[in-house]
Amino acid sequence: MAIIIGIDPGSRMTGYGILQQTGDKLTYIDSGTIRTDTKEMPERLKRIFNGLTRITQHHLKYADEPIYTAIEQVFMAENPDSALKLGQARGAAIAAMVALDLEVSEYTARQIKQAVCGYGAAAKEQVQEMVCRILTLDFVPQQDAADGLACAICHAHSSHSMNKLILNSAMRGRGASKKKGRWRLTEEDLGNLR
């Protein structure tokens, strides 16, 4: 089991989605947006950092399983100023997760859409619809929140993520030992990973 926090960064609105992954089953936990209504960029970044920190700390309190985070990579915008602001918002989000000692994985918008919709150029509405179907939601999340959930779904479906879950399970259940910051697996553990 694991908790996955997906983040869709934005300088005016940052979306987040939180899922629980048990094997190949995904369960919705929470989603929403962090709005930054101020014009001053430093204040926006502070709100993103503080908002994500509070939300994550709340879920860390109740989580018995590992927590992973995933964030959408910056795309190349036609307007350089927009790309710079988006990069700063993304940096604030990553800093919030790293400050809580969480690992951050990054995915392109195309990878996220491909994982959720099966088509890398899917429209935002298609992403929203597929997020609802995959998580069997009885409501439609706001677009930025749906994008955060989509990012979490993408991470859950990535082979990198699945391998980590298998490895964590193997280490906890089979006598693996930690020595000098490295895990030592038994031959049986290594066989289970294949």
UniProtKB/Swiss-Prot annotation:
Catalytic reaction annotation: Endonucleolytic cleavage at a junction such as a reciprocal single-stranded crossover between two homologous DNA duplexes (Holliday junction)
Enzyme Commission identifier(s): 3.1.21.10
Binding site for Mg(2+) 1: 8, 144
Binding site for Mg(2+) 2: 72
CDD domains linked: RuvC
Keywords: Cytoplasm, DNA damage, DNA recombination, DNA repair, DNA-binding, Endonuclease, Hydrolase, Magnesium, Metal-binding, Nuclease
Cofactor note: Binds 2 Mg(2+) ion per subunit.
Active site: 8, 72, 144
Biological-process GO terms, alphabetical: DNA recombination; DNA repair
A UniProt-annotated Pfam family: RuvC
Compartments reported by the entry: Cytoplasm
Cofactor names: Mg(2+)
Domain of life, per lineage: Bacteria
GO molecular function, one term: magnesium ion binding
Subunit (UniProt): Homodimer which binds Holliday junction (HJ) DNA. The HJ becomes 2-fold symmetrical on binding to RuvC with unstacked arms; it has a different conformation from HJ DNA in complex with RuvA. In the full resolvosome a probable DNA-RuvA(4)-RuvB(12)-RuvC(2) complex forms which resolves the HJ.
Function, in words: The RuvA-RuvB-RuvC complex processes Holliday junction (HJ) DNA during genetic recombination and DNA repair. Endonuclease that resolves HJ intermediates. Cleaves cruciform DNA by making single-stranded nicks across the HJ at symmetrical positions within the homologous arms, yielding a 5'-phosphate and a 3'-hydroxyl group; requires a central core of homology in the junction. The consensus cleavage sequence is 5'-(A/T)TT(C/G)-3'. Cleavage occurs on the 3'-side of the TT dinucleotide at the point of strand exchange.
Family: Belongs to the RuvC family.
Name this polypeptide is given: Crossover junction endodeoxyribonuclease RuvC
Originating organism: Psychrobacter cryohalolentis (strain ATCC BAA-1226 / DSM 17306 / VKM B-2378 / K5)
